[in-house]
Structures are given as C-alpha cells and as structure tokens.
C-alpha cells in the first residue's frame, strides 16, 4: 500500500467545522437514525447513510463510516449500484468489513446472512 495512505492528510478547512459533522455521524449510529445497525460493542463508530437517485433504475446505496470516533483506525465507503436505500445494502456490507478489520471476527451471523440473501437489481445493459 502506498505510504501516502498511512499519513494524515490536511485540508484548508478550519477543523472547527468537522466537530459537528463527526458528532452527527456518531449520533446517527449510536443514538438513533438510519445507521444504528453499524453499532459495534466497544467501538465508537461514526457513519452516514446515503441514497443516490438513479433516473435509469433503482437508487444507489451508500454508506460512509470510520471508527473509532477519536483517532480512527479505519475509514470505509461502500457504494452499491442499484442497491436501494443506504441502510439496506451499503451499510451492512461496510459494517461487517469494519467489524472484521477492528476485531478480527464477525459477531453478527444474521447480518452476514442478510447480505448474502440480498438481491441487487442489475438493469439489462446493451439492449
């Protein structure tokens, strides 16, 4: 992996603007919101679901997450074309990857099964 990915990157944006965003992402997972399935015992997970409209078919599913809240060890973004709502397709995938990365195990077999059984609609291409 390129060394640049191990180094903290800085922007020209004043860090004070990040605090309410991070807090909102933490609350979306831990207090209530569309991201509560992303909770992991012992970890302060932050996340945000998203749904991108798709005029050619089913909406796209997105989920952005990082953990722990203070001094993150992982940041992940999952985008599932035609996956529907962010919480229904992208979030479970991201959460399982995050859990495995942080803990070396998966403790939610029901979520693994849900991901395995999820049908993603792929429109016919090249008609």
Located regions from the model:
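Active-site beta-strand/loop architecture of penicillin-binding DD-peptidases
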Residues: 1-10, 16-108
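Short, highly charged C-terminal tails/helix-capping segments
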Residues: 108-127
């Amino acid at each position: 992996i390129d060394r640049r990915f191990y180094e903290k990157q800085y922007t020209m944006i004043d860090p004070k603007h990040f605090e309410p965003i991070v807090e909102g992402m933490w609350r979306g997972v831990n207090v209530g919101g569309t991201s509560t399935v992303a909770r992991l015992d012992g970890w302060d997970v932050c996340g945000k679901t998203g749904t991108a409209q798709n005029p050619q078919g089913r909406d796209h599913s997105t989920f952005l997450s990082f953990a722990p809240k203070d001094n993150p060890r992982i940041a992940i973004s999952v985008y599932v074309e035609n996956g529907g709502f962010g919480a229904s397709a992208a979030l479970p995938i991201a959460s399982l990857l995050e859990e495995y990365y942080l803990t070396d195990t998966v403790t939610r077999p029901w979520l693994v099964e849900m991901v395995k059984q999820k049908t993603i609609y792929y429109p016919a291409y090249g008609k």
